[in-house]
Every structure is written in structure tokens, then in C-alpha cells.
């Protein structure tokens, strides 16, 4: 991009933008350099908003889903130990100049950074604090997270065995004490603080369902193996905020729409801050469409607009 003439301005915080009388955009920023903060204003014929979602904005997320209390972290900051800058200041700025914002698509929640080790269905089970399964593990994440939010502690145990094909996070999760190994079901139950007879019955019942190809408890039909080969791998899984599905309203040309539904001249949007692209849920990896396809359209149309007289 530098070879193409692009200029990168680091440590620049956008604090506002508005239309000029001539139709250009005034973009106000605070630039931090050498321990000082300088206010600057840039003028542009075209402006592309690509500031990301607002998963780290606790208040806005809680307004969308009141079940999301302060202890629910994001997938970018799963343990609450690092800074997550996915907040909604630019969304507020866009609304202030008349941009429409979608409402009602919500958030995508994932059980992601805890005990879950598999990237496919059929090789693990989810159990509650009593050691019992409570959900069809092959259902979409939205259904699973809703079931988890109904649990008293809003978390569950994920169990698999030595036969399953685990993801790249296995070693890291073992080292950090997120996932554990046990040679027997009894040892696993003890470390999980659940009744051993209950957990043993849960696994036996599940294995019978694997043999039949149908689980009468949850209706599950996707199985890849029995859970029986030690060592057993288990860990507590929680819910994390992964994606915001609401944001600035746009059209197929990546133009920002006003509250009246009219394209705002010279204003474009791409990425997670664009709302309503996926509806109320999305497939894993589909965000690349929003970033690359809509990003390409936003950039191309912004350039065309900037070249106008």
C-alpha cells in the first residue's frame, strides 16, 4: 500500500467527523507523539469507516443482551488480562452525523477459549455441573450458548478422549491449566467435582447413542467416535463475545445509509462495524467476506467518488 502512495498515520485517534459546506468530510483526530497530544483536522472527499465492532463495549453489549454481565469477556481478551480496543466511539460519531444503525441482529457468542479442543462435531460432549449432558453438541453456536446461559454457573465441562483429533491449542491449554488429563472417569469426575456414578452413566449412555447413531436425549445424529480411550481430556468452557452483528447500515455498494435510508455522499463502511450483513448469526470465517469483499467495494467506490470534480 505504501508503494501505491498510501500514508499510514499511527497513534491517531479519530474523535469526530462532519460534512463541510462544500460536501467534503472534516475528520478530527488526536495525534500522540513525543508525549504530547496534538489536535488535527483532515479534509477528504471520501471517508471509509473500518473501525471494527464493539465487542469490548460492556455497556452497549449489555443493552443488547442483558445476560452478558461484566465477567463475560471477548474472544480477543478471553481471560481479561489484555487490552481490547473494540469499542463503539466511531459508531457514536457516525450516528451523530446522521448515519443509520441496525438494531436487532445482536451478538455472536462462542464457547471458545476454555475446555473445547475439537474443531469438528462428534468427538466430545458438554456436561453441566451435575455431570449430565444438556445440549446437542453439533447444534449451531447460538443454540449452544443460549443453553449455556441457562445454566446456573453459565459454563460447562467439555470432555473428549485420546482418539479425537485435537486442535493446535491443546499444548497451550494443558500448560496453562485450562485443560486437564485423567486416566480414568473416576479421576476425571473427582477433579471436576461431579458425582462419579453420574458422569460414568453419562458417558456410557452417550457411547450407546454413538453405536445406535442417534441420541434420544438431545436428538443428536452426528458422531465420530465413542468416548472411551484414556487419557480423557477435559476442561471448563465459558462463553465469550466474538462478533457484533449490528452496526452502521449500508447498501451493496458499501455506502453508509442515513436514517432516511439515503446514501450519504462520500461516506462508506466495511468490516465488522457494518451492521446486518449476516443477520442474527454467521458461519466461521464468513467475516472475511465483510472485510475483503465489502472492503474492496468501499475502497473502489471511495476512490471513484474522490476523483469526481
Language model features: what each stretch is:
Residues 83, 91-198:
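An anion/pyrophosphate-binding glycine-rich loop and adjacent beta-alpha core
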Residues 19, 31, 127-128, 250, ...:
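Hydrophobic alpha-helical segments, especially N-terminal targeting/anchoring helices
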Residues 90-100, 192-195, 200-203, 290-309:
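Internal hydrophobic alpha-helix adjacent to the cofactor/substrate pocket in enzyme cavities
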Residues 34-36, 42-111, 297:
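Glycine-rich loop(s) and the adjacent beta-strand/alpha-helix scaffold that form part
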Amino acid at each position: 500500500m505504501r508503494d501505491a502512495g498510501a500514508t499510514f498515520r499511527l497513534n491517531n485517534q479519530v474523535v469526530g467527523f462532519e460534512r463541510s459546506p462544500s460536501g467534503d468530510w472534516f475528520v478530527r483526530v488526536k495525534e500522540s507523539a513525543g508525549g504530547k497530544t496534538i489536535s488535527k483536522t483532515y479534509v477528504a472527499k471520501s471517508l471509509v469507516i473500518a473501525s471494527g465492532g464493539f465487542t469490548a463495549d460492556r455497556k452497549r453489549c449489555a443493552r443488547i443482551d442483558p445476560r452478558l454481565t461484566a465477567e463475560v469477556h471477548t474472544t480477543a481478551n478471553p481471560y481479561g488480562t489484555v487490552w481490547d480496543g473494540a469499542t463503539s466511539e466511531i459508531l457514536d460519531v457516525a450516528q451523530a452525523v446522521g448515519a443509520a444503525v441496525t438494531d436487532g441482529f445482536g451478538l455472536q457468542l462462542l464457547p471458545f477459549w476454555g475446555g473445547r479442543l475439537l474443531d469438528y462435531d462428534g468427538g466430545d460432549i458438554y456436561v453441566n455441573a451435575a455431570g449430565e449432558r444438556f445440549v446437542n453438541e453439533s447444534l449451531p453456536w447460538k443454540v449452544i450458548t443460549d443453553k449455556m446461559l441457562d445454566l446456573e454457573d453459565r459454563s460447562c465441562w467439555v470432555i473428549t478422549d485420546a482418539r479425537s483429533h485435537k486442535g493446535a491449542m491443546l499444548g497451550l491449554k494443558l500448560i496453562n491449566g485450562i485443560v486437564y488429563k485423567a486416566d480414568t472417569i473416576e479421576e476425571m469426575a473427582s477433579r471436576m467435582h461431579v458425582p462419579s456414578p453420574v458422569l460414568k452413566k453419562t458417558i456410557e449412555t452417550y457411547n450407546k447413542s454413538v453405536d445406535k447413531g442417534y441420541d434420544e436425549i438431545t436428538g443428536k445424529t452426528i458422531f465420530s467416535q465413542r468416548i472411551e480411550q484414556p487419557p480423557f481430556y477435559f476442561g471448563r468452557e465459558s462463553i465469550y463475545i466474538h462478533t457484533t452483528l449490528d452496526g452502521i447500515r449500508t447498501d451493496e455498494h458499501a455506502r453508509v445509509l442515513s436514517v432516511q435510508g439515503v446514501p450519504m455522499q462520500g461516506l462508506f463502511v466495511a468490516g465488522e462495524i457494518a451492521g446486518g450483513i449476516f443477520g442474527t448469526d454467521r458461519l466461521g470465517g464468513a467475516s472475511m467476506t465483510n472485510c475483503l469483499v465489502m472492503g474492496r467495494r468501499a475502497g473502489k467506490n471511495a476512490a471513484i467518488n474522490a476523483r469526481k470534480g
